[in-house]
């Protein structure tokens, strides 16, 4: 019996929304998306479908109401052809993506945005649960490890994990047949280009 192995090679350091870094990611085999930035999440989402580089996006949130924790949630979602993307699941905030892609000068000049991004706190136990689920999903997709779910929701208050189906919207600009799907370099990625000062 042959055994399939998983090997990790290389290191890319930088902001994934920078054009040069994003270009390097198009040649990878797989991406784990662990970010608090909407812009980087939007970039990885589109890159996964446009360049056919599967990815797993994961996120956590703690909602506080009246000074008390109302919910503790996590989400793990595979981004690959025939699976709905973050746009299909309304998982991206277009205004936040726009704001994060602006330069500091553009943000100061924009009359529509007054507030900076509010990062979610990193909570190790919650991050650990979501990361473990992401690794299990990866193993089930690429090895003989059992598991069929390609989207999971974690409820930290109830201590439960439930699978969810995320169908691809036929008219989706990212994963739909008339969108970025398999377009490779013939479509632009939502990247930040280096600004040259004159």
Language model region names:
Residues 1-5:
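Glycine-rich phosphate-binding loop and adjoining beta1-alpha1-beta2 segment
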Residues 6-12:
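Rossmann-fold cofactor-recognition segment
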Residues 12-20:
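Conserved SAM/SAH-binding loop
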Residues 20-198:
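Glycine-rich phosphate/adenylate-binding loop
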